[in-house]
Amino acid sequence: MRAGIRENVRFISKTQTDSSALVAGTFGLHASLTLSDASLDECRAAVSSDTGFHVHTAEHESDEYDSLNKTGLRVIDRLHKHGILGPRTITAHGVHFDAREIQLLCDTETWLSHQPRSNMNNGVGVTPVESMMRAGIRVCLGNDGFSNAMWEEWKAAYLLHKAHHRDPRRMHGYDVQQMAIYNNAALANVFFQNAPIGRLIPGAFADIIFVDYHPNTPMTAGNLPWHIIFGMQQSMVTATIVAGKLLMKDRQLLTLDEEEISAKAREIAPSVWGRYQAEVAKIM
């Protein structure tokens, strides 16, 4: 555990000392059910009071059961007790929060990231995103490492809640847009304050993609979410600019050797799988 704490502290310190860095960090916890009270206190004490955390919360009911059995507190109450919540902390999932936990996230201005495809894949349930947003929680759209195809996450979020509630009026396209564009940009701006993110204005970070998309019907600000959800695919992105630097042109990566990276990944994957299977065997 202490090696993990040192790694977090080292990475956070490195990004904080470089004002031009395009990477920022929060302290990476796993989940309440894998952390003792002593571990939470040690993690909190290892960094400054304005350092945020990211942590899986109530992804499955077992996380809540574990917290109640160990401490008598639900997950969010427990994290709050140990100083983990706050405006620079990101909680993931929140599938099984109760009303008090939702209110506590609002009161502490803690962020929540919604991962619809991951939750579907793990069969853990559906986060009550709409009621959370109405309550004032700043809900972002993430992917839990499921893949980097974020437009697929838009589509999953849009459809999942309709199917879950058996109501086509649920999860409006504007709600998906609010999470994926405006709230995600607002979260990024918490960590990158040198220039605005998510806006095309003078002085902002020049983060731009070019999309080879030719709509068959008019595209306006009013119907943009549905063009993204039903019309656009990640393969249509032809160029990517980050902070004014061209990283991909004509679908070719300019700063990375894709073939070399893929070959290296295939080379080391079996050893990673082997270590994982060995650890699983210890607890089975």
Task: Please report, for each region that a protein language model flagged, where it lies by residue.
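Catalytic core of soluble alpha/beta enzymes
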Residues: E59-G83, P87-T89, G94-T110, S118-S131, ...
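Thr-Gly-centered strand-to-loop micro-motif
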Residues: T91-H93, H114-R117, L141-N143, A243, ...
